[in-house]
Amino acid sequence: MFKKDVSDKVPIYKLKTTEDVMKYYDVWGDKYDRDMVEWNYTGPQETVKIFKKYSKNKDIKILDAGCGTGLVGIELRKNGYTNIDGADLSKKLLDLIPSDLYKKLEQIDLNKTLDKKSNIYDAVLCVGTFTFGHVKPQALDELIRVIKNKGLICLTVNEGIYEEYGFDKKIKNLSNIKSWNVIEFFKSDYIKSKGVNAWLCLAEVKK
């Protein structure tokens, strides 16, 4: 699926710059959760379902990178995980998150170096963030940096940018240089009502 196939169905896919994305979320924020329900957006549920297969310890420290309004955090909480930090580019979306959902919330541009120490998280989940006009493949290096050895990273990549943005090469290279070991990799329904699929990847970090 290419950008021209989905941009009319999901308008934010037309955006190209970080500034445009932030402005769009400022307007869309109040309707975001409602639209996700109407669109049958299943990314958070699918990702947490896979994640919990490999992470039985519910006390681990997790980063929800690109947390939006907290949809992944809600799914994690439903499954017993409570030690969760959230980070997102949009202050508007962060302001909509229930105050008790995350331990810590930060406004962060994932395309830049993270102001975080290395090896501080047991796992990172990044859902709905690797998509048109949002976060680029090099952000994976920073996410891996903040994860402990043998920690997990679980992410989605919109299929429309998988090759166009170079995620196919990046994911393969991270395996080749032994930065991670990919455990699960498959195409998910993601936003089924819009005909938008995503690649879902779960990997163990190696250091």
Role assignments for model-derived ranges:
Residues 114-124:
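A short acidic, Gly/Pro-enriched loop at the edge of an enzyme's catalytic core
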